[in-house]
Design a protein with these regions (language model features):
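Short amphipathic alpha-helix used as the core "switch/output" element in two-component signaling
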Residues: 83, 105-116
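Two-component/phosphorelay signaling modules centered on CheY-like receiver
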Residues: 47-73
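Receiver (REC) domain active-site loop signature in two-component systems and cognate sites
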Residues: 99
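Alpha4 helix (beta4-alpha4-beta5 surface) of REC/receiver domains from two-component response regulators
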Residues: 106, 127-148, 154-158
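Acidic catalytic/metal-coordinating carboxylates
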Residues: 76-77, 103-107
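Hydrophobic/aromatic residues positioned on beta-strands within the core alpha/beta folds
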Residues: 123-125
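Active-site residues of response regulator receiver
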Residues: 44, 96
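Acidic, metal-coordinating helix/loop segments flanking the phosphotransfer/catalytic sites
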Residues: 73-92
């Protein structure tokens, strides 16, 4: 399956998602017992980005050489994501930093109160000053993974696999 080279806010995949999503959920139900599947929760207030990330990650499951496969849930509303969050269900959060109502750090602080073991990767289109961020948010919230948007598909997958290993 062909993957986009980069993830941009282009919105061209919305129609494709419904069909792909149903097929991918069926495939995952069959393979769920396999330990190489990891559950990813994406929260990004840009619907096109959230959908594109989901498509890219789940499409990468078709690569037989990839040792970790992804089961992805995406939200565009951090409050809804928090409300629906299931402790001990997700392996990794992929969260946009800048969102209205609740930023990515605030969301992760609340989620980590529910599930201390979930790993976190932050995304942003802005500059990343990790030292300043760690001073503002000194809790375990700040994981080792910061992803700058737009991101190359292969780089995104590599970073997520590294966090999950």
């Amino acid at each position: 399956m062909v993957q986009p080279d980069k993830i941009y806010n282009n919105g061209k995949n919305e129609v494709e998602v419904g069909h792909k999503q149903a097929r991918k959920e069926e495939e995952f139900e069959v393979s769920r017992s396999s330990s190489n599947y990891k559950r990813i929760l994406i929260v990004d207030d840009e619907p096109d980005i959230a959908i594109s990330l989901k498509i890219v990650l789940e499409s990468s499951n078709d690569d037989d050489s990839q040792k970790i496969k992804f089961d992805v849930t995406s939200y565009t509303d951090p409050v809804e994501a928090l409300s629906d969050f299931k402790p001990n269900f997700y392996d990794l959060l992929l969260v946009d930093i800048t969102m209205p109502i609740m930023n990515g750090f605030e969301l992760c602080e609340k989620i980590l109160q529910l599930d201390i073991n979930v790993k976190v990767c932050f995304m942003t289109a802005g500059e990343i000053n990790q030292k300043a961020i760690r001073e503002l948010y000194p809790l375990r919230t700040i994981g080792g993974c910061f992803i700058k948007k737009p991101v190359e598909t292969d780089d995104l997958i590599r970073q997520l696999i590294a966090e999950l290993e």
